[in-house]
Amino acid sequence: MQLTELIETTVTGLGYELVELERTGRGMLCIYIDQPAGISLEDCEKVTRQLQHVLTVENIDYERLEVSSPGLDRPLKKLADFERFAGSEVSVTLKKPLDGRKTYRGILHAPNGETIGLEFEGKKGEAAMLDFTLADIDKARLIPQVDFRSRK
């Protein structure tokens, strides 16, 4: 079984989604997990303990294991991610330029079949729509919405 499959099976078996897996040259494994309710420290500890056991049993060599949430600027990789975060502000970088541009920032529309929509501000300030598929994307991320105003 491949490392990604092994980790994804373990993570999903615990009720979480594997968002991303990074393996550094120095033997560090970084695992990013999520679930609709968000991720707590206890969730990260639970997944870490289980993965340590599984990686030992499967004799997978690593120096350090780090499990965390994907953060406010979570990457969007699967069609289900684009469905879940429809209505959110995102940044999308395409593999090939479209109208001389590769990076777009706008409001994500729910996928229609394989086609994903992004409403963005066009050249003249008017609303424009970009339609693309997962195959067109180099990377896509949520744009964090943080409100620093105090609540009284």
Curated annotation (Swiss-Prot):
Q: Which UniProt keywords apply?
A: Cytoplasm, Ribosome biogenesis
Coiled-coil intervals in this record?
none
- The source's superkingdom equals Bacteria
Q: Where is the signal peptide?
A: none
Cited Pfam families: DUF150_C (PF17384), RimP_N (PF02576)
Subcellular location, in the record's words?
Cytoplasm
Biological process annotations from GO: ribosomal small subunit assembly; translation
Primary location group: cytoplasm
| One GO location term (cellular component) | cytosol
Briefly state the protein's biological role.
Required for maturation of 30S ribosomal subunits.
The record's similarity note reads: Belongs to the RimP family.
- Return the protein name: Ribosome maturation factor RimP
Q: Which organism is it from?
A: Burkholderia cenocepacia (strain HI2424)
